[in-house]
Amino acid sequence: MIFLMREFVMVEVTKINGVKVLINPDLLELVEETPDTVLTFTTGRKIIVKESRQEVKNLVKSYRKDIFAN
């Protein structure tokens, strides 16, 4: 799911503990499946999410389409 938040868009993912969080995909540097999906940001922060690598990829692609369509 994609949200408009104060002039920028964020993507919703679910942390491994079930908590839904919004991430800025522009800061996403690396998506790994180890087998858990680990998101690494340009800040060095990492989070483990329930979504698969492919699901994260699709969310980011959808985000980019929305950004460039407007």
Regions found by a protein language model. Name each.
Residues 1-22, 26-70:
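Eukaryotic intrinsically disordered, low-complexity regulatory linkers and tails enriched in Ser/Thr/Pro
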